Design a protein with these regions (language model features):
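Short hydrophobic alpha-helices and adjacent helix-cap/hinge residues
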Residues: 1-199
């Protein structure tokens, strides 16, 4: 095996766990990874490179401000608290967005029926940023098409933005999105560079 392309956080976790036993001298490159600790661990190896996945929340919020002047509330919908914790830890965000209210719906903490209830409570002067809302307490995985249909049906024409290119389905405006094709291309180029330097 000449090299390994690693495509998400679970895959990188597996790679790091078994690196010494299975992948010791095999070059690797990752993409679609947002766990900073695992990225730091991986990059300690000389034959590992990669691309961190970073959501462009500032650009999406600016698009909302520009195109939806009535918006006072932004509701983030996400699997877990990772993005929320990073966003709320930034003092810059508190200053930049002092005129906006931010709310979070964390899907891992609720069942799908509760999700519908939370969506019905979203006020008309809101916009939604859909991050990674595909896991619930009672459902391990729902596709973005199903999630976005639900959001659209229960939020009464509130603008919906996404952070992933494949999160743009019917009813979703878009936004400054992450494109995993482009990330994988960059990661592949890095991997080839490592392989070619070693041979």
């Amino acid at each position: 095996m000449e090299g390994i392309l690693i495509g998400d956080d679970d895959a990188l976790e597996f790679y790091l766990k078994y690196k010494e036993d299975l992948f010791k001298d095999i070059p690797a490159s990752f993409f679609g990874i947002y766990d900073k600790k695992n990225i730091e661990r991986a990059l300690k190896y000389k034959n590992v490179a990669g691309v961190r996945e970073v959501e462009s929340l500032d650009q999406i919020i600016e698009l909302i401000r520009k195109h939806h002047k009535n918006v006072e509330n932004i509701v983030f919908i996400d699997n877990d608290n990772r993005v929320k914790n990073e966003f709320e830890a930034s003092e810059d965000n508190a200053l930049k967005y002092s005129n906006l209210n931010f709310e979070w719906i964390i899907t891992n903490d609720i069942v799908s029926d509760e999700f519908v209830h939370e969506l019905k409570k979203v006020e008309e002067n809101s916009a939604i940023i859909s991050l990674y809302p595909i896991h619930f307490k009672d459902v391990k995985w729902l596709g973005y098409d199903d999630i976005n249909k639900g959001i659209k049906n229960y939020t009464n024409q509130i603008p919906i933005y996404a952070c992933l290119s494949y999160g743009i389905t019917e009813g979703v405006i878009g936004g400054k999105v992450i494109n995993h094709y482009n990330q994988s291309k960059s990661a592949t180029e890095m991997l080839l560079k490592i392989i070619n330097e070693e041979t």
